[in-house]
Design a protein with these regions (language model features):
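Bacterial N-terminal signal peptides that target proteins for export
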Residues: 2-13
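Exported/periplasmic ABC-transporter solute-binding proteins
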Residues: 25-58, 66, 71, 75-81, ...
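Bacterial N-terminal signal peptides
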Residues: 11-21
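Short active-site segment of divalent metal-dependent hydrolases/proteases
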Residues: 87
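Hydrophobic anchor at the start of a short beta-strand
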Residues: 63
Length: 263
C-alpha cells in the first residue's frame, strides 16, 4: 500500500525540524561577564560611577553600585556578606569594618568636609556661625547620626561646639543622607542644613544652594577610603579599581566633584 500524503508530510516536517534544531545544540553560550558589587555613600556616587565605567571597559566586567547612607550600607555588608568594595563618607565606618573583619585592604582616594548650606543667595541672611542652627527663626534640617556619614559628622561637630542637644530640639526633621538634605533646600523644606561640601558642586544642586563654611576648629577634612571586602569574588579587579581610584587620574575625578581639594 502506498503511504498516504499526510504521513509523508509529517515525516518531512520532523526531518526539517531536526536539521533546524540540531546545529543549535552545538552553539556555545556567551560567557557571562564577571560582576562586581560596590557599596558607595551617596556623596561619592558620581566619581565612583565614572571610575566604574573605565574599569568595566578595561576588564570586560560589569560593576553594580548600590548607594545609600554609609551606616546603612555597613549594616547591609555585615548582614549579607557579599560584595567587593565599600566607600563610605567617613573613615570611621572603614575603621568599624576593619574591626569587624569585613575588610582586608584600603586606599585613600579623596576628602570630604561638612558645611552649612542655605538657599541660593542666602535670602534670609543666615550667619555662618554654628549658633544659627539653634535659631528658631530658621527651618533647620540635619542628617540622622544613625544612618549616614553626614549625620555622624554633624553630631561630632555639634558635640564639639556643645550644642548638639539644642540643635536637635530646634530641627524640623532628620534625614537619612546627603541627597535628602539637598532635596530639602531645593524644595523649600529647609532654610538651613548641614551637608557635605561636595554636594554643592553637583550640577543639579549648584544653582540652588549657597555654602556657609564651618570653621576648621569644628569641621576638619575627612579622608575618603575605599575598602576591599574580604568576601570579594573578583579581588584582582577590585584591587585594580582601588589602584586606579588612588592614582593621579582617579583623584582628578574625585576633585572634579569637590571631593579632593577641599578647603
Amino acid at each position: 500500500m502506498r503511504p498516504r500524503c499526510s504521513d509523508m508530510f509529517m515525516k518531512l516536517c520532523i526531518l526539517l525540524v531536526f536539521f533546524i534544531v540540531l546545529p543549535g545544540c552545538n552553539e556555545e553560550r556567551p560567557e557571562r561577564k564577571k560582576e562586581l558589587l560596590v557599596y558607595c555613600g551617596i556623596t561619592m556616587i558620581k566619581p565612583m560611577t565614572e571610575i566604574a565605567a573605565f574599569i568595566e571597559q578595561e576588564y570586560d566586567c560589569r560593576i553594580l553600585i548600590t548607594k545609600g547612607g554609609s551606616g546603612n550600607l555597613l549594616k547591609s555588608i555585615k548582614a549579607n556578606k557579599v560584595g567587593d568594595l565599600y566607600l563610605p563618607g567617613s573613615g570611621s565606618y572603614i575603621q568599624s569594618a576593619l574591626e569587624q573583619g569585613l575588610i582586608t585592604d584600603t586606599v585613600h582616594v579623596g576628602f570630604n568636609k561638612a558645611a552649612m548650606m542655605v538657599k541660593k543667595g542666602n535670602p534670609k541672611g543666615v550667619s555662618d556661625s554654628l549658633d544659627s542652627l539653634v535659631d528658631n527663626r530658621y527651618f533647620v534640617v540635619i542628617g540622622n547620626p544613625e544612618s549616614g556619614s553626614i549625620g555622624r559628622e554633624t553630631k561630632k561637630i555639634l558635640d564639639k561646639k556643645g550644642i548638639f542637644s539644642d540643635v536637635v530640639n530646634n530641627v524640623q526633621t532628620m534625614t537619612t543622607d546627603s541627597k535628602d538634605l539637598s532635596r530639602c533646600l531645593k524644595n523649600d523644606e529647609a532654610d538651613l542644613v548641614v551637608n557635605w561640601y561636595a554636594t554643592s558642586m553637583w550640577p543639579e544642586n549648584k544653582d540652588y544652594v549657597t555654602v556657609l563654611p564651618i570653621s576648621s576648629e569644628y569641621a576638619g577634612k575627612k579622608k575618603l577610603i575605599i575598602g576591599l571586602l574580604r568576601f570579594s569574588r573578583y579581588p584582582e579587579i577590585a584591587e585594580a579599581f582601588m589602584k586606579y581610584a588612588a592614582s593621579d587620574k582617579g583623584r582628578a575625578v574625585f576633585d572634579k566633584y569637590g571631593l579632593y581639594d577641599v578647603k
